[in-house]
From Swiss-Prot:
It comes from Fowl adenovirus A serotype 1 (strain CELO / Phelps) (FAdV-1). This is Uncharacterized protein ORF19. It comes from the Viruses.
Length: 453
């Protein structure tokens, strides 16, 4: 949608406010009222100095933060039109500005940076380099920018959304960029719906893996020294997260070798592969990924450089992880985001996390204690029953409180997904260890409720 949404108080619309709006490329002003210069070659030139522009400045009709409970604005081509400042609760844009993107200098690959800003000014960037050996990367330099930018409007910042699957075909963002319904075989194979250079078919996703590498200090690299396929995200307290997009059907069957340079220490790795079905849980997720965990051993340290060599061996059984919030509602076949499905079954705590300790929190029995704000990637709030053995109890999943936990652990939960807050209350004096779980890290908090007296 172009982002023209009348105000909630408009007499044409009434006073009812919708829950969530995602606006793609809302223009600064309406296109109504312009006149085309015959010497220009399209809208982009019309908006530049080569054309004549006489727009109506109807700012009241452009989307605003008050039009919904949560407003996301995506500017995928801000060099041509759109706002140059954050607007809405979340603002996403591409750093590839101008009519000629640096990503399009070669047809052999797509390279560039995608950035997103939260309304509070928090910035998240991804460096993306998709090589030519992906089956249909040729000619995608313009088109792939749209889904990569679109990804940032999701409720999580997980890199693995790029390889998410749904019904054995690419997930909703591929339908968005191609205009196809991949659940219909006639649309899957036809060459009349969209230009072939825009297509990202199933093989592009099914042939790819994601390798998650978490290090303390400098990032660890694959033995290939290949800078492509990767993106790195900084974490707190000197940790770094690197995602490798790997196209190798045999990956995970043999040790994976990594090198941590400049004093970096490897913490753990995981391997993800997109799947279209969820076999291990009795619930239907939006997308699913098969995960393999590894055990890593430091096998050598190079004397002159200090580089550490690690051999990582796959261990245990592979298991499925649901991705409940990986789609925006782009068609009737996809669930809305965030779905109103209450307490979802949290599948598993991974073998390895980066654990951060939060200062202890003390409250009074019968009163709520406030914790947060947390990142949008929060997956679960977990506590543990100490007796007779350390038993995990899930208090909330994906910002939905589990209402049946009060009778089991004596804790009531309230959540606010917009402001990323969690409130906990115990009716009796008790002390609990709380885990706030994301994909890579856990924030551990010890909460104590004292007697009201």
């Amino acid at each position: 949608m172009r982002g023209f949404v009348p105000p909630t108080s408009s007499p044409d619309r009434g006073s009812k406010k919708v829950g969530r709006i995602v606006a793609l490329d809302p223009p600064l002003e309406s296109f109504q009222g312009y006149r085309m210069d015959l010497h220009t070659k399209g809208l982009n030139l019309l908006l530049s100095s080569g054309g004549h522009w006489s727009a109506n400045r109807d700012a009241d009709s452009v989307i605003s933060r008050d039009d919904a409970d949560y407003v996301v604005v995506i500017a995928s081509s801000i060099g041509s039109y759109g706002f140059d400042r954050p607007i809405g609760d979340e603002y996403i844009r591409s750093d590839l500005t101008g009519q000629k993107h640096e990503a399009c200098e070669s047809r052999a690959w797509w390279k560039g940076q995608i950035c997103a800003w939260s309304y509070s000014g928090r910035r998240h960037c991804e460096d993306v380099h998709i090589p030519f050996d992906f089956l249909r990367s040729d000619g995608l330099c313009y088109h792939i920018m749209a889904p990569l930018t679109f990804m940032k409007a999701l409720d999580t910042h997980q890199a693995d959304q790029l390889l998410s699957m749904h019904g054995s075909v690419p997930s909703a963002w591929s339908a968005y960029v191609t205009g196809r319904d991949y659940s219909q075989p006639t649309q899957y194979y036809t060459e009349e719906v969209a230009d072939w250079r825009m297509l990202l078919r199933e093989d592009d996703m099914a042939s790819s893996y994601l390798l998650l590498v978490v290090t303390e200090g400098n990032a660890a690299e694959l033995w290939t020294y290949d800078p492509y396929y990767t993106k790195t995200i900084g974490m707190e307290h000197g940790y770094s997260v690197r995602w490798y997009f790997i196209r190798d059907r045999n990956v995970g069957e043999a040790p994976i070798v990594l090198y941590a340079r400049g004093g970096g220490v490897l913490k753990f790795i995981r391997l993800y592969k997109g799947r279209g079905t969820l076999t291990s849980l009795g619930a239907r997720a939006m997308t699913t990924q098969e995960v393999t965990e590894f055990t890593c051993f430091r096998t050598h340290t190079y004397y002159f450089t200090g580089t550490k060599k690690y051999d990582c061996h796959p261990g245990g059984h592979r298991f499925d992880v649901p991705r409940w919030r990986s789609h925006i509602n782009v068609s009737a076949h996809h669930l809305p985001v965030p779905p109103k499905c209450g307490c979802l079954k949290f599948p598993k705590l991974f073998k390895d996390y980066v654990i951060f300790d939060h200062p202890n929190v003390v409250g009074r029995a019968g009163e709520y204690v406030s914790l947060g704000p947390w990142s949008t990637g929060l997956q679960a709030v977990v506590t543990f029953k100490p007796q007779p053995r350390r038993h995990r109890v899930v208090l909330a999943t994906y910002w939905d409180a589990c209402s049946n936990t009060k009778r089991r652990v004596g804790i009531d939960v309230r959540t606010d997904r917009k402001n990323h807050m969690v409130w906990l209350k115990a009716d009796k004096p008790v002390s609990r260890e709380m885990w706030f779980v994301s994909e890579v890290d856990v924030v551990r908090v010890y909460v104590t409720w004292l007697s009201p007296e």
